[in-house]
């Protein structure tokens, strides 16, 4: 609210995933749904310009989407979003585990590990000319 009052645009973020502690661990699905919807309405009242959330059950996402007064950006929530989104790192395959709704278009984790190993080996063999590479002649 303080940021909004200071004229700074704010996008709210919540959801059912582990990154969202305010929903509460150990609660029933119904309690989580009520908490989620309450948090979304509170963010709207505080003046957010949009809400982002992840992994919300379809029926809850639908209810929130129908009640929302701001744009909704969501991942893993079905069609009930103004703009579906996907985590960039999952899209590029930087994560070993992917959420069931996420599709990887490459395996950059493996490629990054291999590139790093090659770099380390070149350093160990003394093949990197540090002074030249950083512009010190």
Regions found by a protein language model. Give the residues of each.
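Alpha/beta enzyme core
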Residues: 1-137
